[in-house]
Amino acid sequence: MSLEKIINDAWEIKDQISPSSDQKLKDAINQIIADLDSGKVRAAEKVNGQWIAHQHIKKAIMLSFRIYPMENLNGPYSSWYDKAHLLKGKTAGWSKEDHEKAGFRMVPNSPVRKGSFVGKNAVLM
């Protein structure tokens, strides 16, 4: 079954989706988030001068909020309470080399969620 079908089928029963949902669905959602993070896919893109929204990608993002619980996050400047699955992933644990390889700059306390593609030479504030 394709990722798109898994996501579209789950969307039809979105009110029933929870952290205890099927692992196949979680894997599909996580794969789409990883593909967004790497820039492999986009939620929307311009094709022949027209913007095309990929609905199953948007649905996967929304469903991800249903399969993960709220969490408390503590950092050096503040603490947060949110769906941490997307906050902990983009640069958590990165080394200096990882940041240099990614090619973008993040000033302190600038969040970027997992699933957000950040292009080279960007400065996040």
What are these regions (language model features)?
Residues 1-104:
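Terminal amphipathic alpha-helical/low-complexity segments used for targeting or macromolecular assembly
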Residues 100-125:
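Structural signal for interior beta-strand "rungs" in well-ordered beta-sheet cores
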